[in-house]
């Protein structure tokens, strides 16, 4: 993809309900021509079953982030309040830091990261977006067409 000047913003790969199939969610920005070219490049790969452009479709989209935040005795309560307000979850609490799991859209996670940046981010990792089209249809049905 990079050789064709497509910059991938996020990439998520996972198992599906089919043992022999994995699903990739690739997020990239570009005009309609660029998106179409990216789809054509993906179809040239071995064993690509379906490329689905959901740019203009109603979708559910989330990503996950783990954020290790510097947390001292003096600011720990403030940090934990921000976690609660952001619907995050504390997954590790240690002397001097707290690891938080946050899920949401890219902008929701960006907002949380901005809010806690003033306390000091010791480490940050994000999954990239996973996306599913809303409604009763499925990618499996699209593959069979």
Model-derived regions, located:
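A conserved regulatory-domain signal marking ACT and ACT-like small-molecule sensing domains
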Residues: 1-145
